[in-house]
Each structure stands twice: as structure tokens, then as C-alpha cells.
Amino acid sequence: MTLALRPDQGGFLRPFGCGWFIREFMLGHGPEDSAKINPDAGTCQADIFYHYKLALHRAYADDAVAWENEERIRNGKPIYTPEEYQERFEHLLSRIPYKLTKCRYHSFQRYFHWLKQLGWVGLTGKEEPSSVQEVMPDYDDAPPRKYYRLTRKGKEAPDYEWSNPQLTLYPERGRDYFREKRRNHHYSRRKPTKSRKT
């Protein structure tokens, strides 16, 4: 018996998960060619988000060049040389608008807040002035950039919990609750776009 493989409705397809990226970044592994940090010194939330978005852009550009290579194979043309591949990658990467990929800072902030509630990330005690404080020194209420690092609990948490911290934090809701929420959400219809083949 064969099962049809198809994605579930709703949600966004991503080459890698947000939780996985945050954990690997804060461990200092530099996931998806991002910057490597000192895990003991930690990093601030805005920097993690910035590197996550750039990594998503690189993954999308790489997928687009791989798609072009597949088209070249189908059309009987030779695949890109490594130099041509890199050139196409850089070209496509430069054309991706910053807000094209789906993650927005508010969503990331909520996700990070769940990690704080679970006790998986904690403050290091280091703070630095935020850009708002630098531009408007008279604005005392502007929050500083606070540095976070992974806690022992966060390092020991399994992958499935990192992939859905909201479900880990609120297990009483269960997957059926989230399925029902998605079912009741009315996604807007997209206008048809041009095919890549034309």
C-alpha cells in the first residue's frame, strides 16, 4: 500500500525550523552559514532574528538555483559550474526582499517569549543601548538590548519540544486544539502568478 505524501494545509513551509535555528545559533554552531557566537557570552534577540532571516534567504536562493539546475537537466543543458552556481546564487539572494520570507519580528518575539517561559533561555546580565536609545538619548523608556544564553534545561530539551514550544508550554490544549484553530482560520486566496516556465 502506498501513501500519498503531501503537505498539510495551513502554516508555512520552511527549509528549517525556528526553534532548531535558535538552539543551534545559541550553542555557537553557526547554523546554515550564519555567524558563530560565544555561547557563554550569549546574544540578543534581535541579532538571532536577523541571522535567522538571512539564513532563510540563503536557503530560498539556494533552492531557486537548484530548481534552475533541474530545469537545465530536463532541457538537456549542462548544469551550472560551481562559479556559475555561486554567481546565480548571489544574484537571486540580492533580489529577495527582506520581508518576503514569512517570519516577522513579532512572531519571533512570541516564540522567544515561550522559550523564556519554559526556562530554556536566560538573561546573561549584559545589556547595551538599543538603536532607539542611541538615536533619541532623551527617551528613557526605550528598552536596552538584553543578552540571552541557553540554560542547561534548554540544552537538554528534546528536538520535538523545540519544534513546538507552545504545545510544550500548554500541553492541555493538545494538537486537536491547534488543528481546530487552523481549520477555522480563513486564509486569503492568492491571485494566480505566472508560471516559471513562461
Where are these regions (language model features)?
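Generic anion/oxyanion-binding catalytic loop in active/binding sites
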Residues: D33, I37, P97, P143
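Amphipathic alpha-helical dimerization/coiled-coil segments
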Residues: R149-T198
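Short acidic/His/Gly/Ser-rich catalytic and metal-binding motifs that mark active-site loops
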Residues: A61, P82-F89, S130-Q133
